[in-house]
Regions:
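Short, glycine-/Ser/Thr-/acidic-enriched flexible segments
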Residues: 41, 73-74, 140-141, 189-192, ...
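C-terminal terminal segments
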Residues: 30, 86, 214-265
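Helix-rich terminal scaffold detector
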Residues: 59-187, 191-196
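Short, glycine/charged-enriched hinge/interface segments at domain edges or termini
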Residues: 1-110, 249
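Glycine-rich, charged/polar anion/phosphate-binding loops
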Residues: 20-22, 50-57, 159-160, 170-172, ...
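Solvent-exposed alpha-helices and their adjacent loops that cap or buttress functional pockets
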Residues: 4-5, 27-29, 42, 57-62, ...
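Short, well-ordered strand-loop elements centered on a beta-strand within folded domains, enriched
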Residues: 8-14, 183-186, 243-255
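A charged, well-structured terminal subsegment
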Residues: 198-218
Length: 265
């Protein structure tokens, strides 16, 4: 549009279509439109739509409540430790995931090698609470002080398994308390074993409770050779890249041992 100050009129240099630049009621959202499906994970885009439409309250599922125990005299929360001690990375790693995977996290400290009675009493109390998942780290293998499985079996269970053909993470334990919506995951103590079991057992369990869509695997071309034992399912730390023509390539990284963290960064 151009305004001519001399002749005091506006020169329109193009034709207008009827109703151009007019916003009609219902042109964006219509009455009874479904905004989001049930079990959808709400993101900032949904919040924008809710506020635009004046939606003040929505029904959501409660976050899962997780209680966490570490175990072993060798585990320490201190930064400065003697040579026989290990810093407690598993507790902090899992806690850091609570916002990503919709759970509340409470740490109940480190169980010492002779804390069988203490662990039993704690479990007995927790099973009366609103806790959904109990996680232990370490103490599930076949060592002298690995008492976690023995204590768990003292409770009435509807489901139980221990040890899977998986690396890292072979010693994992799972138990469901009979007549209660409460489960126990016993994770191995090595950092990568613990991380793998949390990722491929605990997170899918949480997603299932919340009604989230099942994950689909991504397939790609392996760039380097990798040998594994046939009887084991193997999870390997890898680097995924996309080529210029859109192909997915996967590189298996060095340092696959379950105690090595560097290649996980």
């Amino acid at each position: 549009l151009i305004k001519d100050k001399i002749n005091n009129y506006i020169l329109i240099k193009q034709k207008f279509k009827k109703f151009e630049n007019v916003r009609f009621k219902g042109s964006d959202f219509k009455k009874k439109d479904l905004l989001i499906k049930k079990n959808t994970l709400i993101n900032p885009n949904h919040i924008m739509a809710f506020k635009t439409l004046g939606v003040g309250n929505i029904k959501v599922k409660k976050k899962i409540n997780i209680i966490f125990f570490s175990s072993g005299n060798e585990i320490s929360e201190n930064n400065y430790i003697p040579s026989w001690k290990i810093r407690n990375s598993n507790h902090h790693y899992i806690k850091s995931l609570k916002n990503n995977f919709l759970f509340n996290f409470k740490n109940l400290g480190i169980l010492k090698d002779n804390d069988e009675k203490k662990f039993y009493n704690k479990l007995h109390k927790i099973l009366k609470s609103k806790t959904n998942i109990i996680i232990t780290s370490g103490g599930v293998s076949k060592g002298k002080f690995d008492f976690i499985p023995l204590i768990i079996k003292k409770f009435k269970l509807s489901h139980f398994f221990k040890d899977v053909a998986l690396r890292p993470g072979k010693p994992i334990l799972f138990a469901k308390i009979k007549n209660k919506e409460k489960v126990i995951f016993g994770l191995p103590g090595n950092p990568m074993s613990s991380a793998a079991c949390f990722r491929f057992f605990v997170i899918p369990y949480i997603a299932n409770i919340l009604g989230q869509i099942r994950e689909k695997p991504i397939r790609g071309v392996l760039k380097n050779s990798f040998i594994k034992k046939k009887k084991f399912t193997r999870f390997a730390k890898s680097k995924l890249t996309t080529t210029k023509d859109g192909k997915i390539e996967i590189e298996i990284l060095k340092g696959q041992e379950s105690f090595r963290v560097k290649s996980f960064i």
